[in-house]
């Protein structure tokens, strides 16, 4: 700023203050043990950490509008489902905007359910119980063989399906009474209320439809589902090393084998399995596809109910319009008859001298009576003809 003709340099501390207020991406990191920690890092650190491209990370930008997407990459799953924006790897989950009120329950659910596959790390610490745990491990090891990324994906799908189902239930609770009230009493307030509910239903239907379409697209393509098997791809990359060390673990030290987590055993098993086998993921996606499809069916039923209500209201309005037209016909017919009466009165009321106007005062009542009778007869004829043609009284 110029003062007395001199340039005054800007305050450098003010510039530093502005730089400190630059917003950074907010993330939450949840590992396989269920521990979570906040991460305030930029997009380049995220890209380097999970090895994804910038275009994939751009999908998770809350300032940009992207449809619901589930992308499988080499070492990560990019998940964009409404407010749930996450990056899932074979060992951890990066969740966007963890302080959002809709995301906080997802974080808590991830912390609760992700450590299930690693529960065997905490067992077998007694002196004589370790070998027994190793022997019984074969019986309990098959209870939860889902890889880490599938458990995280299941939490996200369950959260978004439950969220959309809850929004649908709220909409149904408000919509059905409003529609019933509108059918009984058509008013501007009720019409505006139903209009807002219909707009909300249209937006919610579009959101549910996007999630359903994404799940359907995944189920239709086995290659896309195979890309989501991160543990299998990671195990396949390290299979030569694993195949050498694996026999010694089980033959020499059963106690070490008892400490191997279920997720690790599942990863080792997939090394020798069919890489095109996507049955486990297909069953997982089908369950939530049916759930989201049920939500969409509820919205479709609500839309049909709204359409039926609109048709009923239109029928009522058409009926009222027909009644108004009938009333207009009656009034028009009466006006024609009165105009005939006025015509006679106007003829006799003209100020024109004629001889037979004198000495015939007794004719006034006959003229009035005959003219009125003629008008009534004409009105009855018009209304009878209209009723015969079905224009009135139907």
Curated annotation (Swiss-Prot):
Principal place of residence: membrane
One GO-annotated biological process of the protein: pollen development
Gene3D superfamilies, per the entry: 2.40.128.330, Magnesium transport protein CorA, transmembrane region
InterPro entries listed in its UniProt record: CorA_TM1_TM2 (IPR045863), MgTranspt_CorA/ZnTranspt_ZntB (IPR002523), MRS2-like (IPR039204)
GO MF, one example: magnesium ion transmembrane transporter activity
Region (Disordered) location: 115-145
Keyword presence, Transport: yes
Short motif (Required for magnesium transport activity): ranges: 349-351
Pfam family, one: CorA
UniProt keyword annotation of Magnesium present: yes
Gene Ontology annotations for the cellular component aspect, listed alphabetically: plasma membrane
Tissue-by-tissue expression: Expressed in the whole plant but preferentially in the mature anthers.
Membrane-spanning residues: 329-349, 366-386
Location in the cell: Membrane
Membrane topology (UniProt): Multi-pass membrane protein
Record key words, sorted: Ion transport, Magnesium, Membrane, Transmembrane, Transmembrane helix, Transport
Family (UniProt): Belongs to the CorA metal ion transporter (MIT) (TC 1.A.35.5) family.
Biological function: Low-affinity magnesium transporter that mediates the influx of magnesium. Plays a crucial role in male gametophyte development and male fertility.
Any further remark recorded for this protein: Has the ability to complement mutants in Salmonella enterica and yeast lacking magnesium transport capability.
Listed name of the protein: Magnesium transporter MRS2-2
Source organism (scientific name): Arabidopsis thaliana (Mouse-ear cress)
Name of the coding gene: MRS2-2
């Amino acid at each position: 700023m110029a003062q007395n003709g001199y340039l005054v340099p800007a305050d450098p501390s003010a510039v530093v203050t502005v730089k400190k207020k630059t917003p950074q991406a907010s993330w939450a990191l949840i590992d396989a043990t269920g521990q979570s920690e906040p991460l305030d890092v930029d997009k380049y650190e995220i890209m380097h950490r999970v090895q994804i491209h910038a275009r994939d990370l751009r999908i998770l930008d809350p300032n940009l509008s992207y449809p619901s997407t589930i992308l499988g990459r080499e070492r990560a799953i990019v998940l964009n489902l409404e407010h749930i924006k996450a990056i899932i790897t074979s060992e951890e989950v990066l969740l966007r905007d963890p302080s959002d009120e809709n995301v906080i329950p997802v974080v808590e659910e991830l912390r609760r359910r992700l450590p299930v596959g690693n529960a065997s790390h905490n067992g077998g610490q007694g002196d004589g119980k370790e070998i027994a745990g190793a022997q019984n491990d074969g019986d309990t090891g098959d209870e939860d063989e889902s890889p880490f990324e599938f458990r995280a994906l299941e939490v996200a799908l369950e959260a978004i399906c439950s969220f959309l189902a809850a929004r649908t239930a709220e909409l149904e609770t408000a919509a059905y009474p409003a529609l019933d009230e509108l059918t009984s009493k058509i008013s501007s307030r009720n019409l505006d209320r139903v209009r807002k509910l219909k707009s909300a239903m249209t937006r919610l239907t579009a959101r549910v439809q996007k999630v359903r379409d994404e799940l359907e697209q995944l189920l239709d393509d086995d290659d896309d589902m195979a890309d989501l098997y991160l543990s299998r791809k990671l195990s396949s990359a390290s299979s030569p090393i694993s195949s050498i060390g694996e026999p010694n673990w089980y033959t020499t030290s059963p106690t070490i084998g008892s400490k191997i987590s279920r997720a690790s055993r599942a990863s080792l098993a997939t090394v020798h399995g069919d890489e095109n086998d996507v049955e486990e993921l297909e069953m997982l996606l089908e369950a939530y596809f049916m759930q989201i499809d049920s939500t969409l069916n509820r919205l479709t039923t609500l839309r049909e109910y709204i359409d039926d209500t609109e048709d009923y209201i239109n029928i009522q309005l058409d009926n009222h319009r027909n009644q108004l037209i009938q009333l207009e016909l009656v009034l028009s017919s009466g006006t024609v008859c009165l105009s005939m009466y006025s015509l006679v009165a106007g003829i006799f009321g003209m100020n024109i001298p004629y001889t037979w106007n004198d000495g015939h005062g007794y004719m006034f009542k006959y003229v009035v009576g005959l003219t009125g009778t003629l008008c009534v007869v004409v009105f009855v004829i018009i209304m009878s003809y209209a009723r015969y043609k079905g224009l009135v009284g139907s």
